[in-house]
Regions:
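Short intrinsically disordered terminal tails
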Residues: 1, 87-88
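Noncatalytic modules at the cell exterior or secretory-pathway interfaces
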Residues: 26-28, 63-77
Length: 88
């Protein structure tokens, strides 16, 4: 049975942890609806090496076991809405 959790995380101009996968991995939905872009990646994510997640939308990511997903904002803080679906 899958465990489901949700959170609102404010991504800042330095790498901000959005979610950490469980020991057997998880599926993560990240929704963003504000004006500035963010970049997704590992702990070393920046606006030059991250995966661009533009203004409006939702991205669906499968995280491997114990992986961590970070985000960094182009400007200020950007709210990111997280839905984590993991295995029990």
């Amino acid at each position: 049975m899958a465990e489901v959790s949700s959170a609102k995380v404010l991504a800042g101009t330095t790498a901000t942890l959005l979610v950490q996968a469980d020991t057997d991995g998880c599926r993560v939905l990240v929704h963003k609806d504000q004006q500035h872009s963010i970049y997704l990646g590992g702990a070393d994510v920046t606006t030059t090496n991250g995966f661009l997640f533009d203004h409006d939308g939702t991205v669906d990511i499968s995280l491997p076991a114990n992986a961590k997903l970070y985000a960094v904002s182009v400007s200020g803080t950007e709210p990111c809405y997280i839905l984590k679906i993991g295995n029990a």
